[in-house]
């Protein structure tokens, strides 16, 4: 199956999809595990939250989020990679409150309920701008009033002004959409879709950001 977006790096398949968690651990010298745990702690999850996980991957993030939930809390993952869905299902076998479905996040969809939080982690930057707008609208539609859209991804910066230790791997690894993503004012863009009350937490030399916003009125 061909990629929807040939210039994107977020449609992961084959070997990378099968061993994604291990690859991330090795590439980060074990640091990714600690980083993602800190980031999810910064979401300030309430124990009864219902969370929608856009681009849910292998379920690693879902398990970390679930540690903050009671039995009344829920997580639904949306993912399109069958290899990743299989890993997700294996990880959540003993958890009745976590589920996953095969669903694209870049196209309109409807769910049976509204959610307290929509979380997207290192997926958003890998889409064309017009498709990112679709994802924002999907998040808005899926949230209850005052629900939170939480984006964990690159912060805003000018690539050529970043330190070499960050700039070189960023230019080597990232797709063209990432270079456009980091130079956009996402608070302004999100506000145009009805999101308000922005909060952020920065990581890794301020190059990574957890951006939280609340659903207001469109």
Task: Annotate each predicted stretch with a short phrase.
Residues 70, 128, 143-145:
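Helix-to-beta-strand junctions that scaffold the AdoMet/dcAdoMet cofactor pocket
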Residues 109-118:
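A short acidic, Gly/Pro-enriched loop at the edge of an enzyme's catalytic core
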Residues 117-130:
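A short SAM/SAH-binding and catalytic strip from SAM-dependent methyltransferases
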Residues 4-7, 151-193, 198-202:
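C-terminal alpha-helical "lid/dimerization" subdomain adjacent to the S-adenosyl-L-methionine
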Residues 1-43, 60, 167:
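Conserved class I S-adenosyl-L-methionine
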Residues 133-145:
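A short glycine-rich, Lys/Arg-flanked "PGG" loop and its adjoining helix->strand segment in the class I
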Residues 194-195, 201-218:
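Core SAM-dependent methyltransferase catalytic element
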Residues 52-54, 58-107:
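Class I SAM-dependent methyltransferase SAM/SAH-binding core
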């Amino acid at each position: 199956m061909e990629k929807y977006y040939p210039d994107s790096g977020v449609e992961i398949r084959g070997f990378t999809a099968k061993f994604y968690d291990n690859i991330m651990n090795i590439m980060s010298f074990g640091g990714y595990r600690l980083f993602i745990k800190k980031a999810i702690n910064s979401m300030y999850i309430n124990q009864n939250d219902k969370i929608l996980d856009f681009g849910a991957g292998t379920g690693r993030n879902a398990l970390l989020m679930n540690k903050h939930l009671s039995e009344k809390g829920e997580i639904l993952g949306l993912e399109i990679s069958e290899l990743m869905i299989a890993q997700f299902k294996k990880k959540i076998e003993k958890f009745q409150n976590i589920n996953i479905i095969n669903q694209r996040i870049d196209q309109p969809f409807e769910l049976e309920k509204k959610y307290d939080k929509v979380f997207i982690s290192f997926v958003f930057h890998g889409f064309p701008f017009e498709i990112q707008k679709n994802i924002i609208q999907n998040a808005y539609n899926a949230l209850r009033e005052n629900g939170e859209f939480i984006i964990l991804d690159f912060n805003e910066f000018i690539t050529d002004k970043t330190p070499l230790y960050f700039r070189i791997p960023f230019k080597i690894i990232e797709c063209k959409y990432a270079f456009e993503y980091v130079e956009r004012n996402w608070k302004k863009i999100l506000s145009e879709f009805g999101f308000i009350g922005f909060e952020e937490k920065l990581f890794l030399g301020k190059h990574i950001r957890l951006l939280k916003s609340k659903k207001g009125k469109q």
